[in-house]
């Protein structure tokens, strides 16, 4: 079958920042090659005199979009003037208004359904709104075809209501109240492989969801909902999304209906049948939005720290932060009397790094939350952010030492999260060697280590309370095993200590590697001093 992979860019509200958008597109295309089209959801035009002046440059031909660009219609009365034809028209060279509602099918066979505007309950609706009649008309025009299986892409400016049901947490609590029930119904029926929306100023990439009932209906393709932030936003939230797609009509059915590991139930199924909403959403603090491709603009910000005179670090001029507390004794809660503070290397706002007791290597360290969290999937977004900062700092540090690190977590028979970070000499083995060794040794013990999909995250795969073992390689590749019954407690260390990697099998059990208190203090000081130039908590 003559499959042709299309390369598509999508962006959120432009608000008249045309130069910012198109300059960004030029940079992307210079770095990653040409894309076939740019799809813009949300408000393309701004309302300020300055944005009108910028638009006149494109309208006159003085400036030109570097890619074929398709936009949706107005979302307010002020910008209605730009859209002369409700059925769509060319606005400027390389910039096309799709229309109020309809289906756009290119020569490639890619099917793009679209609905402009915001929801209105009144008739007649303003020119920048859609009504239930518009949604019904669009649905019927497509679904009346007996061969209809869904569309490749759905573009709406507004969010669908209840999109986070069964899914990952929304970026903020306010987002729960937004959205159109009509768009939820439209998405439920059109079954888009990708659904893009904007207007809320947020980047939210929902887990893929099913379009069929398991064991009751034939398998169908999954849908992905993605909201993008506004172009050039000051918070550096992601506003461009890049993806490859082969039109549904040219895709083998077996490939089309493959279900990813992190797929969820359909968020609209209950609302479509007018039944009560699901209450299965996690709180907004439970998850941080997943970043994909090369458009993550977030940069960690360091803070100046001062020493407490005991080797630890304290935050300057900050109110004490409230962290979750254990119900009983815990060896790893920083405020606990049981914690061995002489092993602490660095302390942030939410996490700390400590030398591993009985480490595989002298620079084997742990990343731990200050508060009492059992696993990665329990972490709040603030803690996740700082964990990522520590991971990045350690990665850079070990690279200067000619090493790569392997990180693993065992959420089984443990009450406090410990991210084990073990550096390995580059000359010792390749990343692929490490990956293969983990998989093979898991198989030898009757376990299956699954590779987590490239753009997925462990919080999308395991619910809080789920026992699991997780590995992250320096390449970003991730392996996951859901623990059902028994699990060897030293498995991560056993793999790394094995002949295939470090060849130090006698150090597989930490209890066989314990040092004296004085030796531990020396090792900790040595590591702390070496790591200091890379410790973001010490930076201005």
UniProtKB/Swiss-Prot annotation:
Ranges for the region named Disordered are 265-326
Q: Provide the disulphide bond pattern.
A: none
Residues spanning the signal sequence: none
Q: Which InterPro entries match?
A: Cwf19-like, Cwf19-like_C_dom-1, Cwf19-like_C_dom-2, HIT-like_sf
Q: Which GO terms describe its cellular component?
A: post-mRNA release spliceosomal complex
Q: Which CDD domains match?
A: MPP_CWF19_N (cd07380)
Q: Where is the composition biased (Basic and acidic residues)?
A: 267-277
Q: Name one Pfam family in it.
A: CwfJ_C_2
What GO molecular function annotation could you give as one example from this UniProt entry? RNA lariat debranching enzyme activator activity
Instruction: Provide one Gene Ontology biological process annotation.
Output: mRNA splicing, via spliceosome
Q: Which family does it belong to?
A: Belongs to the CWF19 family.
What is the name attached to this protein's record?
CWF19-like protein 1
Its ancestry begins with: Eukaryota, Metazoa, Chordata, Craniata, Vertebrata
């Amino acid at each position: 079958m003559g499959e042709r992979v299309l390369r598509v860019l999508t962006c959120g509200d432009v608000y008249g920042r045309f130069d910012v958008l198109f300059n960004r597109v030029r940079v992307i295309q210079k770095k990653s090659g040409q894309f076939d089209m740019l799809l813009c959801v949300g408000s393309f035009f701004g309302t300020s005199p300055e944005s009108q002046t910028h638009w006149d440059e494109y309208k006159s031909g003085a400036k030109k979009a570097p890619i074929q660009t398709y936009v949706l219609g107005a979302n307010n009365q002020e910008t209605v003037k730009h859209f002369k034809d409700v059925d769509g028209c060319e606005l400027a060279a390389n910039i096309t208004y799709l229309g109020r509602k309809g289906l756009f099918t290119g020569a490639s066979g890619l099917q793009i359904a679209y609905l402009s505007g915001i929801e209105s309950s009144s008739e007649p609706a303003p020119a920048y709104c859609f009504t239930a009649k518009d949604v019904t008309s669009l649905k019927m025009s497509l679904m009346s075809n007996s061969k209809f299986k869904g569309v490749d892409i759905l573009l709406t400016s507004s969010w669908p209501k209840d999109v986070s049901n069964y899914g990952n947490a929304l970026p903020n609590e306010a987002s729960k109240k937004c959205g159109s029930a009509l768009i939820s119904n439209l998405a439920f029926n059109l079954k888009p492989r990708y659904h893009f929306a904007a207007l809320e100023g947020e980047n939210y990439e929902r887990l893929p969801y099913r379009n069929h009932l398991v064991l009751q209906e034939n398998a169908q393709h999954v849908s992905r909902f993605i909201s993008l932030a506004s172009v050039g936003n000051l918070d550096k939230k992601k506003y461009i999304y890049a993806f490859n797609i082969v039109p549904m009509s040219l895709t083998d059915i077996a490939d089309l209906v493959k279900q990813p590991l992190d797929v969820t139930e359909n968020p609209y199924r209950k609302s479509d049948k007018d039944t009560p909403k699901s209450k299965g959403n996690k709180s907004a603090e439970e998850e941080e939005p997943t970043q994909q491709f090369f458009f993550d603009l977030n940069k960690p910000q360091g803070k100046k720290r001062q020493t407490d005179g005991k080797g630890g670090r304290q935050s300057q001029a900050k109110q004490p932060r409230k962290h979750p507390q254990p119900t009983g004794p815990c060896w790893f809660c920083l405020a606990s009397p049981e914690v061995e503070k002489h092993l602490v290397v660095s302390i942030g706002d939410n996490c700390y790094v400590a030398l591993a007791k009985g480490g595989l290597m002298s620079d084997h360290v742990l990343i731990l939350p200050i508060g009492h969290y059992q696993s990665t999937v329990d972490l709040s977004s603030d803690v996740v952010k700082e964990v990522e900062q520590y991971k990045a700092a350690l990665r850079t540090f070990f690279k200067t030492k000619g090493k790569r690190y392997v990180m693993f977590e065992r959420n089984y028979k443990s009450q406090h999260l410990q991210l084990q970070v073990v550096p390995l000499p580059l000359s010792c083995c390749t990343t692929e060697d490490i990956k293969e060794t983990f998989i093979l040794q898991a198989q030898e013990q009757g376990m299956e280590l699954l590779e987590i999909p490239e753009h997925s995250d462990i919080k999308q795969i395991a619910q809080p309370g789920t026992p699991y073992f997780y590995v992250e390689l320096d390449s970003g590749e991730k392996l996951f095993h859901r623990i059902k019954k028994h699990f060897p407690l030293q498995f991560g260390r056993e793999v790394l200590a094995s002949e295939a990697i470090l060849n130090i099998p006698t150090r597989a059990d930490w209890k066989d590697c314990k040092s004296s208190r004085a030796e531990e203090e020396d090792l900790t000081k040595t590591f702390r001093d070496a790591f200091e130039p890379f410790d973001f908590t010490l930076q201005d």
